[in-house]
Structure formats: structure tokens, C-alpha cells
């Protein structure tokens, strides 16, 4: 409709990677497409699209400031709000041959230990995906025919699942940890036996209270997000919460590590930093306030909309 009547159409992605089946219609001259992750912007720019732009996300600081926090209900040492990303990878691997299983296991191991870099899209090649499809086909004519993109996503979500489960399990044995998410499987409940499962929270009213009342807010970034600052990280700091996030290049670019937020580069690093900052209340509060000040200075919706309208 916008293309037909030459009406400007603006879109701003808040997910990375963007859930796009194809780039069809993206090059319409009416479109102005903004990506919050620089890596995604560069991907589509390199495809020849000239109507794509880079624009980090933002926070409604004024709204968050006016929310009354129930510290008694939401207060805790460490909290995590988010999905655990149960992946299809184990099911997909159950029908692979031994070489394919070993190849995937190696990728998972390397990506688990790699922070600030993403190898999955490079090593899950079309050739490898085709070999998996042939393997499935040899077992059944009705077998699923997984695409390279689907297989890469399965690996990325599995690595994210392993990281989040490991982080929560270890921290839960050392500190008070609250998990706000949807359902847990029976296996997950056993692994996270020392973690308090609190169910989901409302984004607008409850989640900000969790961030403000928690001493430490975890933000293990989805592995497939190659560079962007996730909205969750900005939400945490916009509430005056203390952010402990996995290393993300754009977070390190826009925020000063250990002054406005804290970034970790391994599970061991995350555990050590959680221990340290729980034992140092004043330093933790200083970092939280500095993070909030940075949000108020450069991550307001008013500023982002002005940039968007300039285009």
C-alpha cells in the first residue's frame, strides 16, 4: 500500500538477527529501515540496499522514573528476566551421522567460550546443511529438510540456552537468584533447583520493579545478536539497575565497562564479578547511577526519533 501510493514507511528492528524470510520488497523507495545492531545494518547494506540505517534502541526514562518499586516483593541479590531458549538442536542432532554430530559439538564448544565474536554463520555452511539434509533423506523420504539458516539458529539458540542454564545454576548455588520466565521443563527445574522460579512479569509495570529492586541484573545476550545493545540492557540501566552483561561490542562502545555497567567475557568471569559486586554495595550503586545518567544523556526516545526523522 505504501509502495503503491508513495507513502514513507519507517520500520525499526528491535530483534537481532531480524526475523526476515527474504529481502524482497525491502528496496522499495518508500521504505526507511533502521537496525539497532550495526552488524545487521552492515549485512543488508552489503546486499546493496541503500535505504537501511543504523539506530540503537532507546528507553522511556520519564515513564520508568514514575514507577513505584515494591522492594519487598521484587528485591533480591541476582535476577534474570528472559527466555532460556530451548533449542531444537538436540532433536536435529539425534538423526545426524557421527561426523556431523562431532562438527556441531565442536562449534558449540568454541562459541560457548567466545565472547564478542560469532562464528556460527561462517561455519554452518550451505554445503554442511545440504549434507545434513541428505542424511535425513537417507533415513526417511518424509524427513524434515532443514535450511542453513534454520540450522544456524538452532545452534545459536542452543549455545544461548547452555550459557543461561550454566550461569543460573552456578550462581544459584552461591547467591539468592530469582528467575522470571515462562514455563520450565522438569529437567530445567532439576538443574536450577537452587534458583527461585517466579514466572513471567509484565513488561510495563512489573519488570522495571525487578530491575530496580535487584542488586544485580543478568543479561546474557543471545549469541546470534552479533553486536547490538539489547533492549533488555537499556531497560535495566534505565531503571537505575545494575547491569551485568555478557560482552557485546556496542555495549563496550557506548558504555564504560566497570563504570556504567559491567561486562563479562566468560562464565568464570561472570561468577567472579557477581561475587565481587555483591560484596561492594557502594561501588555497585555508583555504577548503577552512572549507567542511568548515561541513558538519560544519550538513549532517550526523543533523541532517537529526532535522528529517525532526519532521514
PLM region descriptions:
Residues 2-14, 49, 93-107, 166, ...:
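A short, gly/pro- and small-residue-rich
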Residues 30-40, 73-81:
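A polyampholytic, Gly/Pro-enriched intrinsically disordered region
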Amino acid at each position: 500500500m505504501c509502495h503503491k501510493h508513495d507513502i514513507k514507511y519507517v520500520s525499526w528492528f528491535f530483534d537481532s538477527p531480524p526475523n526476515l524470510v527474504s529481502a524482497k520488497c525491502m528496496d522499495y523507495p518508500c521504505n526507511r529501515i533502521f537496525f539497532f545492531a550495526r552488524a545487521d545494518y552492515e549485512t543488508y547494506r552489503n546486499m546493496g540496499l541503500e535505504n537501511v540505517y543504523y539506530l540503537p534502541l532507546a528507553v522511556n526514562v520519564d515513564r520508568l522514573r514514575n514507577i513505584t518499586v515494591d522492594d519487598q516483593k521484587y528485591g533480591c541479590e541476582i535476577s534474570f528476566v528472559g527466555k532460556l531458549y530451548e533449542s531444537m538442536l538436540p532433536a536435529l542432532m539425534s538423526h545426524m551421522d557421527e561426523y556431523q554430530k562431532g562438527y556441531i559439538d565442536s562449534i558449540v564448544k568454541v562459541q560457548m567460550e567466545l565472547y564478542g565474536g560469532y562464528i556460527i554463520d561462517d561455519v554452518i555452511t550451505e554445503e554442511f546443511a545440504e549434507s545434513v539434509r541428505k542424511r535425513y533423506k537417507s533415513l526417511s523420504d518424509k524427513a524434515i529438510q532443514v535450511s542453513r539458516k534454520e540450522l544456524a539458529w538452532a545452534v545459536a539458540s542452543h549455545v544461548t540456552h547452555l550459557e543461561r542454564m550454566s550461569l543460573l545454576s552456578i550462581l544459584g548455588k552461591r547467591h539468592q537468584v530469582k528467575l522470571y520466565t515462562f514455563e520450565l521443563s522438569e529437567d530445567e527445574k532439576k538443574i536450577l533447583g537452587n534458583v527461585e522460579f517466579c514466572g513471567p512479569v509484565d513488561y510495563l509495570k512489573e519488570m522495571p520493579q525487578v530491575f530496580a529492586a535487584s542488586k544485580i541484573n543478568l543479561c546474557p545476550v543471545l549469541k546470534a545478536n552479533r553486536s547490538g545493545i539489547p533492549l533488555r540492557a537499556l531497560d535495566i540501566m534505565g531503571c537505575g539497575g545494575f547491569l551485568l552483561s555478557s560482552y557485546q561490542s556496542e555495549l563496550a562502545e557506548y558504555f564504560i565497562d566497570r563504570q556504567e555497567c559491567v561486562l563479562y567475557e566468560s562464565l568464570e568471569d561472570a561468577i567472579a564479578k557477581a561475587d565481587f559486586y555483591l560484596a561492594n554495595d557502594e561501588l555497585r550503586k555508583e555504577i548503577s547511577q552512572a549507567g542511568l545518567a548515561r541513558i538519560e544523556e544519550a538513549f532517550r526516545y526523543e533523541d532517537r526519533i529526532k535522528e529517525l526523522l532526519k532521514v
